[in-house]
Each structure stands twice: as structure tokens, then as C-alpha cells.
Amino acid sequence: MVRVGRAMLAAAMMAAMGKPVAAEVLDATYRGTMVCDKLPFTSNKMREAIEVTISSGAARYNHVVRLRNTAVEAVAEQGTGTVDGQKIQLQGTWKSGSRQYEAKYSGSFVRRSARLKGTQTWTDGGKTATRACAGAIKRPLKPFLPRDKK
């Protein structure tokens, strides 16, 4: 019984001395998908790829735009953002013909991924519509990241 008590005390001490688990936001390319609500001129919700590159606290991203079930738009949504600790903020735009939108997404990193939420505010022929988007991005495991050149 004394042995069990000592073992539990030792385990508790080791756990208390360990570092807290926090996300390690590394300079890397994070890939994932965003699901956005239906627009008045689309038939369904849209699930599209997003790629976010983080370098020294700055972010830039590309997000695929699809207005129909088959064709991807020639121009992708593009934007920039910031990483502050475990938080990420992204802002971008897209335009094609008379349609355009402004996007804002934000989220938090947990381990090697981040969950994103935000909105796209569309303008089409003088009408405005806002839709919600949510998704996630994830970086490769650390051993698979490009190595720094020395």
C-alpha cells in the first residue's frame, strides 16, 4: 500500500512539473477545407480547399472559389493575416465580373491544426448577401516539414 501511494505521489509530482500542452505554431503551409453556407445563386453549401502559409507571424492564403457544382472559378480568393500566439486572423477578397466578396476568418491553433470560422460578404448586381463559413487547416508532422538551410 505504501508503494502504491509513493508511486502515485511521484506521478503527480512529474505531471505538475511538466510543461503545459500548447499548440506549436510553426512556419509552414497548412492545408484544409472550408464549408460555406448556400448563397441565393448557388444550389448547395460549398466545401472547398484552403491553403495558409505562415512565416514569422504573418499569414497569406488562397481559397478555391466554386459557384457551380462542376467548375472552379479561374481566380481564387486571396488574402493575408496575422498569427498572435495561438490565434490566427485572415482577411481576403475575391472578384470575377460583377460578383465579388470580402472574407474574414479567425480561429485558434490546437496542436498542429486550427479551426477557422468567419463570413463572406458578397456583392452581386447591387445586392448584398453574407454567408457563414467554417473549416480547419492542418500542417504536416514536424519531420515532414522542409529543413532550414544552414
Question: Residue spans of the language-model regions?
Answer:
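Sec/Tat signal peptide C-region and signal peptidase I cleavage site
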Residues: K19-A23
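Hydrophobic helical h-region of N-terminal Sec-dependent signal peptides
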Residues: L9-M17
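Central antiparallel beta-sheet cores of small beta-barrel/beta-sandwich binding domains
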Residues: E24-R111, K117-K150
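Bacterial N-terminal signal peptides that target proteins for export
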Residues: M1-L9
